[in-house]
């Protein structure tokens, strides 16, 4: 039995208007973001070597003046997080209204999820813990995850909304919470502690399609049908705007979309857009890599028919991702209209990434590769320099401590993450910042899981540094990718570099796999000397 497997068993899983080009209005800081830009009709380019690079951005905007950087972190009264579902960097950059955000705020280009799976990642966002610590390892109760597991472990009583509520902050969650909410425990009208305003679809319905769903709206069950005005994302956006307008106290708003998760729901106004787009033809697209791990090596190349189907999937995902831009637009417009843009931090990110045609895999997530684990993360607000890219290693475990610090709350000493507040004045990493982050895939999946796919890797643990991605699979396979010379992670060099270097990476990975709280911040700060010269690809 591999060391990773033994460890795991110990815990038991955003319109395209085809003839019109609109312009995003220039504004300072968080002024109204209400114009639209026509999505590109050509295939995405691959000029950018890093997942979050701003190369190729075509949005017409006026960046915020960042000439006067402050030595002290900016001060905010409110926080808004817009969380997408399954949004990778390639798709983000294809949506001009989303790509434009990189010129409005600070982009964290190495922001990594702890698990490329909805529920475990969302629990991490709330708890600032790796999944081996919060133990919600999958989407559904049957395989050790979902809302029932979160509640059974009583983690719903000690997480982000509770921490900021204690500081007098008014909280709201509109949209997706956790998979299988609210089956059984607490009942279908149940609202977890810490939330003052709550509009969350219950699991009995078709939330992912955007229609025919039921909202738990502050304890009242409200049924929505199939009319255009019933589209879930639009309903949630209106609730978010009303909350911003009506709340006079400091607030935390968590606006959580179901898009662009399959079946790639979108508003009627976005149907028929992005018709000329195709899935990104990166060097890894339908490719055969070098020295592939066993689970991947068995896949044949995708047929032309399958590739054409993937292009259709990509177009649907682009249409769906437009609704994420709608959500950001709604929030930004209301903040500007109410003057609350002057003291609000807005963070736009996602629970995990997604791949379409990577190697010979059709569509999905749950791999250690950057498409699935290195995700969009933008921080926008007064005092945050615009157009700045941060390449330091950050993680979803850092969101809760960041928001809690901004809002004047206190986090428990058992959290695994670090606050990102020190980055906000300039984008420079504070002293003793981490050198690596951990991603894990522990939980099993089955056909009742909304993210079930027959082609996922065996359980794994992965260590990601600014240069390297090292992964150990539970079937004994290992892989190492030099992202400096191989940004698409095609060449596994684990057998061709100094074994001592691989051993050092493995040792650090082992420490992170079993870390908890302060020991995570010790393990991720270990520095390992590169065995290869610093060269450009």
Identify what each model region corresponds to:
Residues 25-57, 67, 525:
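C-terminal region of N-terminal signal peptides and the immediate post-cleavage residues
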Residues 49-116, 488-500:
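Active-site-proximal N-terminal segment of extracellular/periplasmic enzymes that hydrolyze or transfer
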Residues 81-84, 88-172, 183, 203, ...:
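Active-site segment of extracytoplasmic enzymes that catalyze sulfate/phosphate-ester chemistry
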Residues 193-206, 352-358, 398-400, 405-479, ...:
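C-terminal cap/loop subdomain of S1 sulfatases and analogous C-terminal strand-loop tails that border
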Residues 161-169, 237, 241, 329, ...:
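Non-catalytic, well-ordered alpha-helical segments in soluble enzyme domains
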Residues 6-33, 40:
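Secretory targeting and sorting signals
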Residues 69-74, 89-91, 202-231, 244-396, ...:
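Active-site-proximal cap/lid insertion segments
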């Amino acid at each position: 039995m591999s060391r990773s497997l033994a460890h795991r068993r110990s815990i038991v899983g955003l319109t395209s208007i085809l003839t019109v080009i609109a312009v995003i209005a220039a504004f300072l800081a968080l002024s109204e973001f209400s114009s639209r830009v026509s999505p590109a009709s050509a295939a995405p380019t691959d000029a950018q070597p890093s997942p979050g690079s701003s190369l190729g951005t075509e949005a017409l905007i006026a960046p915020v003046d960042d000439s006067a950087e402050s030595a002290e972190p900016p001060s905010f009264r409110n926080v808004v997080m817009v969380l997408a579902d399954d949004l990778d960097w390639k798709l983000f950059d294809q949506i001009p209204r989303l790509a434009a955000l990189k010129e409005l705020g600070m982009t964290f280009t190495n922001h990594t999820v702890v698990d490329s799976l909805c529920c475990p990642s969302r629990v991490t966002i709330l708890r600032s813990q790796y999944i081996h610590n919060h133990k919600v390892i999958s989407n559904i109760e049957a395989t050790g995850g979902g809302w029932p597991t979160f509640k059974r472990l009583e983690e719903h009583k000690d997480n982000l909304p509770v921490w900021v509520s204690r500081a007098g902050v008014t909280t709201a969650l509109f949209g997706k919470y956790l998979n299988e909410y609210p089956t059984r425990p607490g009942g279908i009208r149940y609202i977890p502690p810490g939330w003052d305003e709550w509009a969350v679809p219950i699991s009995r319905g078709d939330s992912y399609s955007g229609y025919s769903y039921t909202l738990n709206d502050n304890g009242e069950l409200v049924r929505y049908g199939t009319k255009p005005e019933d589209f879930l994302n639009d309903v949630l956006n209106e609730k978010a705007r009303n909350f911003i307008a009506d709340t006079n106290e400091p607030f935390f708003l968590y606006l959580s979309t179901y898009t662009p998760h399959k079946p790639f729901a979108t508003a009627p106004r976005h149907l028929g857009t992005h018709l000329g787009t195709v899935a990104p033809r990166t060097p890894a697209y339908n490719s055969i890599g070098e020295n592939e791990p066993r689970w991947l090596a068995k896949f044949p190349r995708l047929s032309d028919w399958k590739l054409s189907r993937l292009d259709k999937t990509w177009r649907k995902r682009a249409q769906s991702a437009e609704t994420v831009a709608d959500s950001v637009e709604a929030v930004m417009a209301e903040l500007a209209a109410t003057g609350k843009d002057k003291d609000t931090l807005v963070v736009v990110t996602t629970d995990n990434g997604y791949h379409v045609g990577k190697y010979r895999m059709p569509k999905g997530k749950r791999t250690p590769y950057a498409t699935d684990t290195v995700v969009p993360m933008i921080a926008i607000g007064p005092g945050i320099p615009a157009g700045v890219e941060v390449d330091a290693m950050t993680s979803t475990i850092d969101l809760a401590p960041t928001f809690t610090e901004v809002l004047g709350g206190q986090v428990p000493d058992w959290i695994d993450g670090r606050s990102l507040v020190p980055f906000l004045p300039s984008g420079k990493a504070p002293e003793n910042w981490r050198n690596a982050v951990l991603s894990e895939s522990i939980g099993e999946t089955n056909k009742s899981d909304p993210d079930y796919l027959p082609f996922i890797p065996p359980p794994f643990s992965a260590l990601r540094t600014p240069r390297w991605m090292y992964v150990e699979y539970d079937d004994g396979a290992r892989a190492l990718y030099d992202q400096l010379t191989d940004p698409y992670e095609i060449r596994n060099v684990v057998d061709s570099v100094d074994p001592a270097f691989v051993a050092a990476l493995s040792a650090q990975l082992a420490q992170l796999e079993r870390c908890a709280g302060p020991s995570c911040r010790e393990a991720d700060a270990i520095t390992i000397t590169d065995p290869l010269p610093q060269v450009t690809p």
